[in-house]
Amino acid sequence: MEALLGYLLIFVARLTDVSMATIRMIMVVKGKRVIAACIGFVEVSIYVVAIGKVLSGMDNPLNVLAYASGFATGNYVGIFLEEKMALGNIIAQVISDYEVEKLVEKLRNVGFGVTVIEGYGREGIRYILNVSLQRKHLSRLYQTVEEHDKKAFVTVTDARAIRGGYFAGMKK
């Protein structure tokens, strides 16, 4: 029973510290220094406990298996948490040629700020709709665009910061 608890401790510790590492890296990229440092402190403290437990029992391959399993699961959980948290802002470009004025109106009615640029593509004139939004609202953007123009081309990029312009909250 004691050995099983040891494996579980190693697994859970590694799962936790790797998940935290994923979130910490996102905070680093987004310039959230203090939050990243705090997460890093807790993360490395947990890591030291896990690696200490493994190194003290290197003769037991199940310790290594628990460590590796916790690492792999921690990556999965970290990515899952990051997707659910949907932190930060993004910029979406919607390229369409189908009743663009109506699409712009729909997007604005939902609460998105939209800037329209005329462009020229392989098939002629296209309109590029630049939309800055919070990541948590991306599915709403996709849904609104899809309802209007199933053939619209949408690209999304991360935005480190957004300043000025129209950046309203979503309407119900």
Curated annotation (Swiss-Prot):
Keywords: Cell membrane, Membrane, Transmembrane, Transmembrane helix. CDD domains: YitT_C_like_1. The chain crosses the membrane at residues 3-23, 34-54, 61-81. It comes from the Bacteria. It is found in: Cell membrane. Its main location: membrane. It is a multi-pass membrane protein. GO terms for cellular component: plasma membrane. Belongs to the UPF0316 family. This is UPF0316 protein Clos_0555. The lineage of its organism: Bacteria, Bacillati, Bacillota, Clostridia, Peptostreptococcales.
